[in-house]
């Protein structure tokens, strides 16, 4: 399998000089790294070339790395039924980078790109309807960014008096708790009714004495 993927990587990089900035093979899958300027050319080639025929787009997702100059990664997962192969295409983008939409190549990418826009704020130019998909109308921010607060900015509830959904600033009923996850977990020491015989087993807690 790896030899087939190596041949595929060599074929793509040779046919599109400059479009693939890096590639690697891991866990039986080929990853191609490109740029926003070359994504449409590379995507079209991967779909149409007889040695590729990646006609199925499985997913388009985002990832956030705030420490990087280009904080976002856009990842395309492709499947070729003809070649029985998968390929992953990655590109990096900043908060204001316009990433060309691949909906004209794979119409199934429509909602995938909307999800990436909704959750990360990645901008896809040329998308037929780039609007939020999972969050509510008027939602503030993008919840899968690493700098998005865990509690969000507002909470949504149904108001019985107003008979409608209302938005209010987040009010925590209690402070966050700090858990010591490095401490060993200790189980309960009581014996459930019917488990009295278990106390005779080595290492089992003693049965409680009758009062």
From Swiss-Prot:
It is a peripheral membrane protein. SUPFAM superfamilies: Nqo5-like. InterPro entries: NADH_DH_suC, NADH_quin_OxRdtase_su_C/D-like, NADH_UbQ_OxRdtase_30kDa_su, NADH_UbQ_OxRdtase_CS. It is found in: Cell inner membrane. It comes from the Bacteria. Its main location: membrane. One of its GO terms (cellular component) is plasma membrane. Its EC number is 7.1.1.-. It catalyses: a quinone + NADH + 5 H(+)(in) = a quinol + NAD(+) + 4 H(+)(out). Keywords: Cell inner membrane, Cell membrane, Membrane, NAD, Quinone, Translocase, Transport, Ubiquinone. One of its GO terms (molecular function) is NADH dehydrogenase (ubiquinone) activity. It holds the Pfam family Complex1_30kDa. HAMAP family: NDH1_NuoC (MF_01357). Belongs to the complex I 30 kDa subunit family. NDH-1 is composed of 14 different subunits. Subunits NuoB, C, D, E, F, and G constitute the peripheral sector of the complex. NDH-1 shuttles electrons from NADH, via FMN and iron-sulfur (Fe-S) centers, to quinones in the respiratory chain. The immediate electron acceptor for the enzyme in this species is believed to be ubiquinone. Couples the redox reaction to proton translocation (for every two electrons transferred, four hydrogen ions are translocated across the cytoplasmic membrane), and thus conserves the redox energy in a proton gradient. This is NADH-quinone oxidoreductase subunit C. It comes from Azorhizobium caulinodans (strain ATCC 43989 / DSM 5975 / JCM 20966 / LMG 6465 / NBRC 14845 / NCIMB 13405 / ORS 571). The gene is nuoC.
């Amino acid at each position: 399998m790896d030899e087939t993927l190596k041949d595929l990587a060599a074929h793509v990089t040779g046919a599109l000089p400059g479009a693939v900035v890096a590639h690697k093979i891991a866990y039986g899958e080929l990853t191609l790294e490109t740029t926003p300027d070359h994504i449409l050319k590379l995507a079209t080639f991967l779909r149409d070339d007889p040695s590729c025929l990646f006609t199925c787009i499985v997913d388009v997702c985002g990832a956030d790395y705030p420490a990087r100059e280009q904080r976002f990664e856009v990842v395309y997962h492709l499947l070729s039924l003809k070649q029985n192969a998968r390929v992953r295409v990655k590109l990096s983008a900043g908060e204001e980078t316009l990433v060309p939409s691949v909906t004209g190549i794979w119409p199934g990418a429509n909602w995938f790109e909307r999800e990436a826009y909704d959750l990360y704020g990645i901008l896809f130019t040329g998308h037929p309807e780039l609007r939020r998909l999972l969050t509510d109308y008027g939602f503030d921010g993008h919840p899968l960014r690493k700098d998005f607060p865990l509690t969000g900015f507002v909470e949504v509830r149904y108001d019985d008096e107003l008979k409608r959904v209302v938005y209010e600033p987040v009010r925590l009923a209690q402070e966050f708790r700090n858990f010591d996850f490095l401490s060993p977990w200790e189980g309960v020491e009581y014996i459930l009714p019917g488990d009295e015989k278990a106390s005779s087993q080595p290492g089992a807690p003693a049965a409680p004495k009758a009062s």
